[in-house]
């Protein structure tokens, strides 16, 4: 089984959009800390909405994960796109896990929503951001798709709770009888987002003329050498 050279991690870490992730993560933690600073007047609904807003904030920063000013240079290297994406995701995953744990712990336990269920929501929002970035890279030539992806993510995050049909029941509260069904839907969305991201991590094959395929490295057809 082929393994990834650990030497690839160092340049990946250097080119990660840590400023965007750090700024978004800081904003998310400030939001998560709000219920604890408000005293006894906080209820579970407010705490849940704050955690949802925190998850969206972090996802907006993660939308910049695949921004790479050198994309047009690295597209021709032997390392496949799936590996390059995977390395960036590998760098982000422990940061995201630690950040979300801190966000949950900042919310007072008395009003904290069920951790497992709200984590599914947060993971789905993050997966949507990452799959959106992967789709933008797969379908476009831009080196910095993060800003556009973040904009597309922010719009449904704000309008979704207001415009979503009641039958979808995504944005429910723990005391709602539809809470379990809602998180079944969140899980389906999560799986769909992961599937889209996996498909978009594949190298595109561009068709040139009739019946000729060109690979990202610039070769077409079998070698005549």
Residue ranges and their predicted role:
Residues 27, 145-159:
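Central hydrophobic cores of alpha-helical transmembrane segments
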Residues 37-38, 67, 71-73, 103-108, ...:
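Transmembrane helix-loop junctions in multi-pass membrane proteins
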